[in-house]
């Protein structure tokens, strides 16, 4: 049996299809969803959502939000999302490396606001690079 999956951002629908399995980057860790899953509402971290519509997996970089699971349907409402297959892997790698360098630089200082901003930028860059297949998803 399949699950209907919808990934929605404020400006578009990123995914609207059925899947056999979904893995969400929830605030408490990776959360696997199969057909018949109990109703659930969970917060999502910045990370990679994995969808298996058939035998292959699709990656989606998600930028935080919520997911609701009910009656074999998953609604994912996120601040931003991008299909891994649409992300340029080399550009994502360069963005990730720049974000890592920036985080290393600001972490040495004592400006908490800049450190938090650099951490968020690094998380977003890591999610995009992972979704593109550049890093092993955790």
UniProtKB/Swiss-Prot annotation:
It is a peripheral membrane protein. CDD domains: F1-ATPase_delta (cd12152). It comes from Microcystis aeruginosa (strain NIES-843 / IAM M-2473). Produces ATP from ADP in the presence of a proton gradient across the membrane. One of its GO terms (molecular function) is proton-transporting ATP synthase activity, rotational mechanism. Keywords: ATP synthesis, CF(1), Hydrogen ion transport, Ion transport, Membrane, Thylakoid, Transport. Belongs to the ATPase epsilon chain family. The keyword Membrane applies. One of its GO terms (cellular component) is proton-transporting ATP synthase complex. This is ATP synthase epsilon chain. Signal peptide: none annotated. It is found in: Cellular thylakoid membrane. Pfam families: ATP-synt_DE (PF00401), ATP-synt_DE_N (PF02823). The keyword Membrane applies. F-type ATPases have 2 components, CF(1) - the catalytic core - and CF(0) - the membrane proton channel. CF(1) has five subunits: alpha(3), beta(3), gamma(1), delta(1), epsilon(1). CF(0) has three main subunits: a, b and c. InterPro entries: ATP_synth_F1_dsu/esu, ATP_synth_F1_dsu/esu_N, ATP_synth_F1_esu_C, ATPsynth_dsu/esu_N.
């Amino acid at each position: 049996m399949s699950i209907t999956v919808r990934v929605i951002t404020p400006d578009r629908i990123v995914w609207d299809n059925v899947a056999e399995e979904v893995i969400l980057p929830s605030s408490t860790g990776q959360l696997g969803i199969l057909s018949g899953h109990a109703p659930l509402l969970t917060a999502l971290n910045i990370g990679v959502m994995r969808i298996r519509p058939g035998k292959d997996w699709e990656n989606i970089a998600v930028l935080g939000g919520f997911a609701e699971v009910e009656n074999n349907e998953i609604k994912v409402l996120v601040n931003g999302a991008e299909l891994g297959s649409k992300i340029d892997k080399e550009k994502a790698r360069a963005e990730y490396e720049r974000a890592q360098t920036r985080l290393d630089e600001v972490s040495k200082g004592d400006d908490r606001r800049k450190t938090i901003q650099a951490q968020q930028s690094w998380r977003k860059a890591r999610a995009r690079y992972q979704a593109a297949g550049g890093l092993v998803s955790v």
